[in-house]
């Protein structure tokens, strides 16, 4: 999530999208927005974010925690992780090993891109569904957030 001081329009659009996705789905859909990490500079004595420095941080940790928490809650038969991030393998293994919940994964697959082949390497046998460019296109949010 860009900070308002850096990109007010993007900040506003992210907030509008979050509101749309959660509207009418209380307790079912949870959207967590994390502020991007910035380097800062002082211009004329005023601290300003450097846009080119912004980075997404901590999202993989949030995904890992959510996966394990949802699996351990006992409220779900299946928990599906949608990611290609290999850093999440320990969370997949932990959830599969310590709960009765079935753990699955979903990843994007492009036959023309060798980097998208294979699955996240885990000790547990995790069912992984490969989604194509058509699936990706169909999953896009068609709304324009003003």
Please tell me what each predicted stretch does.
Residues 58-62, 70-119:
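Active-site histidine-anchored catalytic micro-motif
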Residues 1-75, 115-146:
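A charged nuclease-like catalytic/ligand-binding cleft shared by nucleic-acid processing domains
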